[in-house]
């Protein structure tokens, strides 16, 4: 089968002819319709320090996708051939204390699809049936393909009550932008997002941010005055992994504020713990999605009118994967979709014909 893989311990990702994955008794096999490129995939492409320590070579990568079930293991119940599914990318052990207590998102032994085991940049993917999530009929393939990062945004944003609150999001990557959309949708008052990337800040405004702030050009304190904020932010969502952004967040938080952290610093960082202690701040770490409460919330948010469509900015056929990675690596993109439909090759990725418009929904 056709697949994208990390074949060599150097920069790049390559197309290869991979063997079909083997189906276990408790597994399902998914024929992939659409994949999306994650920031993690870019790290793997770049072969940075984290990738060198983490990624086995060679291996098929990718973990954002939607497809249909084409085979079912003999012990599987609840799924049928033809079901349209995405899947939870963290495969848990099922026997550690957290798993047995129903907190599988905190599994001590979780392994990642496309990180520790073969991934979804392939024509076919096999995962445990437990990890599959059936996509409602009124949610498009494109949105379903980005449920993994959308789930990160939902888990982070909905960690705290948002109604009427002032929210600061540091980091306008795709997850930060989707978190901004979630916050506004569920009733936050002001949603301020910060970054230094002008393209993504403009896109964040389209996603619903009250103010998108380029901290290289504006002071966050001036924006707070502009918005009539006198006591600081109630909620902080740290999405950047940048120590300077987190330190700025701590200074901008109101007393008793709550912070959820998804961004991963590249190295250990120091902060002024006095800001945390004397303000009585609550800090929560976020890793992935809650299984499967976050997935049901994702579906409900979209079904209740949350519009994520601006976040998908580029579309390519899988054979044009290099263009997709170039777009992601440029920093001038939102989410990039790779289509596995062979009919898609008849048109360009920006084609506006009726057939392509249908495929893009």
Swiss-Prot record:
It is an enzyme of class 1 (oxidoreductase). Its EC number is 1.1.1.103. Its cofactor is Zn(2+). GO terms for molecular function: L-threonine 3-dehydrogenase activity; zinc ion binding. It catalyses: L-threonine + NAD(+) = (2S)-2-amino-3-oxobutanoate + NADH + H(+). PANTHER family: L-THREONINE 3-DEHYDROGENASE. Belongs to the zinc-containing alcohol dehydrogenase family. This is L-threonine 3-dehydrogenase. The gene is tdh.
């Amino acid at each position: 089968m056709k697949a994208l893989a990390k074949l060599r311990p150097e920069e790049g990702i390559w197309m290869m002819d991979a063997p079909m994955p083997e189906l276990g008794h408790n597994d399902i096999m998914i024929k992939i319709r659409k994949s999306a490129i994650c920031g993690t995939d870019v790290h793997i492409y770049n072969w940075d320090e984290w990738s060198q320590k983490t990624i086995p070579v060679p291996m098929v990568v990718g973990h954002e996708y939607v497809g249909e079930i084409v085979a079912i293991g003999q012990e599987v119940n609840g799924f049928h051939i033809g079901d349209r599914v995405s899947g939870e990318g963290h495969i848990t052990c099922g026997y550690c204390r957290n798993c047995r207590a129903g907190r599988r998102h905190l599994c001590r032994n979780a392994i990642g699809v496309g990180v520790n085991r073969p991934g979804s940049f392939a024509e076919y993917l096999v995962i445990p049936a437990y990890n599959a999530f059936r996509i409602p009929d009124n949610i498009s393939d494109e949105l379903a393909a980005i449920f993994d990062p959308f789930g990160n945004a939902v888990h982070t944003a909905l960690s705290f009550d948002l109604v009427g609150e002032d929210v600061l999001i540091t980091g306008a990557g795709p997850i930060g932008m989707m978190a901004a959309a979630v916050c506004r949708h569920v009733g936050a008052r002001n949603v301020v997002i910060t970054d230094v990337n002008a393209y993504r800040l403009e896109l964040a405004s389209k996603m619903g941010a009250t103010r998108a702030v380029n901290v290289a050009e504006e002071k966050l304190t001036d924006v707070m005055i502009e918005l009539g904020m006198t006591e600081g932010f109630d909620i902080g969502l740290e999405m950047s992994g940048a120590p300077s952004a987190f330190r700025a967040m701590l200074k901008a938080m109101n007393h008793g504020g709550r912070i959820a952290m998804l961004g991963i610093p590249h190295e250990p960082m120091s902060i002024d713990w006095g800001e945390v202690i004397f303000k009585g701040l609550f800090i929560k770490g976020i890793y992935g999605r809650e299984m499967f409460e976050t997935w049901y919330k994702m579906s409900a948010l979209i079904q209740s009118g949350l519009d994520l469509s601006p976040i998908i900015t580029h579309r390519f056929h899988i054979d044009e994967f290099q263009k997709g990675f170039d777009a992601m690596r440029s920093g001038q993109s939102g989410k990039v979709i790779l289509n596995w439909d062979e009919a898609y090759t008849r048109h360009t990725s920006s084609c506006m014909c009726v057939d392509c418009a249908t495929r893009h929904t």
